Amino acid sequence: MSHFRCLLFTLASLIVAAQAALAQPRFDFDTSPGHLPKTVVPERYALSLTLDPEATQFTGQALLSLRVRESVAAITLHASKLTARRAYLGRRLLAVTTDEINQTWTLTPTDGQPIAPGAHLLSLDYDGQVGSTGSGLFQAPYPLSGKTVRMLATQLEAIFARSVFPSFDEPAFRTVFELTVRAPIGYEVLSNMNLSSSVDDGPMRIHHFAPTPPMPAYLVAVAVGQFDALAAHAAGVPLRVLSAPGKRDQGAYALAALQQLLPYFNDYFGLPYALPKLDLLAVPSNRRGAMEDWGLISFAERALLVDPATSGTEKRRRVFDIVAHEVAHQWFGNLVTAASWQEIWLNEAFATWLASKASDHFNPEWQLPLRQRQDLEGALARDAGAATRAIRSGPVLEDRVFDVFDDITYAKGGAVLTMLERWIGPDNFRRGLAQYMQDRQFSNATAGDLWFHFGKASGHDVGSVAATWTDQPGFPLVEVSSRCEDGQTRVELGQRRFTTSGHAAPALWQIPIVLSHDGIVRTVLLDQATQTLLLPGCPAQPTLLNPAGDGFYRVAYAPAQKASLAAAYAKLPAAAQVTLLSDSFALAQAGSLPMSDYLDLLTALPKVQGPGRSALVAQAGTGLNFLALALAATPAQAPLLVAARALLAPELDAVGWLPHAGESSETESLRSALIVLLAKFDDPTTVAQALAHFDADEAGRQPLPAAIRSAVIEATGRHADAPRFEQLSARLLKAQGEQDLWLYARALSSNRDPALARRVLALSLRSELPNNVAPWLPGMVGEQPAHAAMAYSFVAEHWAELAERAGDMFGSRAWLLPSASHSFNDLAAAQRLRADQQRLAGAPGAAPAARVTAQIELQSQVRERESERLIKALEATARLLRSRL
């Protein structure tokens, strides 16, 4: 490495360290970022709502106990799409000035006198609107006994509390909430806390709930409807899983998971769950994802309910992980809340990290450590491109708040915590975390609070190390070479920023590197541009870096070590095989390694024995799927399909189509993945088998086993002729649950026939499908390269209608056009996306467009570089694989 390059790295390190000292202070309410002034602080909130699931409007009354810290002329708080009917401060009438752009009300005394410091009672009467797109207070329709009925539910994170009640809608404002709901008799009402009393009032019933602990407004939850419930206890806490009528038994798996998780988290934190009950609510139709509201966690049905007759291992794994993530939030996020949205990674990264730990603890048969690299692939790919950002990326604009709810926050943030845990040790990590929770409970926190307690527990300068990961974008490529000297192994390490975009500012990380040498695993801190290690002995197998694949960095081995690892590939530990395959493909994507080297590793897969085959196939699928997009409509497309089939078809032959008694969950996952991949790569035998299984199920001769049901339906959808397409369409329109809605929607959207694809696009505008499914059909159609232009044009033409159905949750409308653009592989498409997105979605659409544009540009680069020269390598790969049969 040149002296100049070393100087650049040194300067980068000094800059990051200086920024860390300035940018990671401990929590202070007065200096916490936000749009509202800190001169008026809410201390208690009595909220009364009149709600009817069949109505599209509601009324509310809010009584806020305020502390005015200094004399002010007016009070400013958040309100959006609310109509004020009356406003008083004590007995003083207030004029309400509405600002829908900034989503605020300014309340000014009509007597012209200032508001003095001290305690005040603010009274507000208002009207609001019930939504239909899964944010704020929304209706969730579902079929029951041949009719459509509705429940009401809430999703207030990040900035939707203000659409349900006037509020100080920022995380730093923690307030006690006391909720009263007036609803028609016959409906049950749920909220964060237990019901304290209820009284009938004519056709209505008034429900009073116990006051909450101090918490931010976005955690308030209410639901009104008819519910079936499963109940249990764990750690002395009453637990329930609630769902729409008729789906009670589908909550059994989630309830069993909850009974395991709550005591586990109590023990891990040394702090018991803080509320007197915990409910999990499955919300049909318009709900997306899940929300950790304290005491009343809500989920999309498919994220919580498990039907044993139709659900395999992968579905159970996803549900367990989502439940674990949301329950972890009861500590990370609820008990201790991020100080502002720019610190939201403290909530989400910790929940991701702890959910993974808990899932592996209770389900070792799933071999989750082998999946860790695959789970990081999306974040690594994003962070290597031009459209990335730092985990802590500065002030967050409210109209773009969901830009930070992404894989950088969740997956990269979780990986950073894993690396820190390895570096300071699990005991120090857990002790520091317990001290952090004790110190900040019922309050807010910043990264500085966390690093302080980790440092105190471990004696390390955790803040300086962590800042190189949280306060700058990107991640390192660690270059390694080794040789034997005098009975020792001399390991030379170097680091530089890894990029697939061809240009990035120089950066330096302090990397907790895990290495495996002669069977011993150790962690070292690479905190310089280059570093030399002397390790005992000269084993035959080269020193492995990041052997578990959970470190957020890539590794490039020197030619001699790379050749040695490739030769010994089948004998490497399973996680190291996955990681080496992952890094080899990423380096080939970036043009730093011949793609033929990656193909050579693929040919070694059939030799691999033992655990981890499903993780290896999933990792191979990631690379092959990318190449299928990059090489679409090029001369290399056909040989790629042949090579993929030659690799994967023998694997499916080995495991067979039908599950066997006593087979492992890994075998089940492997079979499903192979069916889907081989159908995607047009393997004729697999397609014929899938269609035969589907036809037998449709005719009532042989129901599809749960273990292959999803895979067979997806494969059938891709290759369905017109009659089978009609059968799948009928199943979609009469689906009784979200799992099947999404399954049939995906299957139909993947169909190869352009005429049938156009029919799927038309479905997105039909009212029969709920708003959490319909607007995403064009994006799923666009995943097929041959249909991408059709799907893109459809979204652009019908953007207003689709945007209304998609709504604002998770920045949904800003993703409509980018979601239909993933499979393009030419620069003209990237330029068109930028222009059309600006025209349709404006500034809030910039980040989604940038992310997908970066993906298109990478696919274009690989197409230009590889489409001609890869043909012979792919043909040779297929011949070699077939010769081993």
Which residue ranges define each predicted feature?
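Hydrophobic alpha-helical and helix-loop surface patches within well-folded domains
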Residues: 2-3, 151, 209, 238-496, ...
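N-terminal, polar/Ser/Thr-rich
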Residues: 21-59, 145-151, 171, 463
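Extended, low-hydrophobicity, Ser/Thr/Pro/Gly-biased non-transmembrane segments
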Residues: 36, 125-227, 250-253, 394, ...
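Beta-strand-rich binding/interaction modules
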Residues: 84-89, 462-463, 473-546
